């Protein structure tokens, strides 16, 4: 409770101690805040927040930011390898941002996901596709041997389907299932277009 404790309480003590607003000071009220990163790494400088008695309008609040603004903060650290193509990706263009899927303070799954599993998270927007994948009992997705990210880079790719390998679904599938590429005794034409039509 910050209340009228403008120059008192944990915020003031942490600040007056002469140290920068450290995660240790923030944890007094806010619990575990990923101490290795520090609060200010994401939330910005804390002096005005502390001086105003914990006024929430004086600190960067992700719930008040647009998806692109929040993603810009995250991208200041997470811009390498799998996140390199985020800008302009299908998700970025649809106003989906880092905080649409991830929750640093109260994750429900691995990788700070807002859902218990990756498949459940993807299903919040892609229910029809996930249901189709789960419908086939031979699908490794249903058996938990694959996730959406086994084939898709949700953080951006050079193709519209966000595929990790190849530019089409067929190319992506045969990158693991080379025996299905053909030629075959009787050609199976749909497979050369899109394995996902049936599978």
Region annotations inferred by a language model:
Residues 1-197:
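Short sequence/structural segments immediately N-terminal
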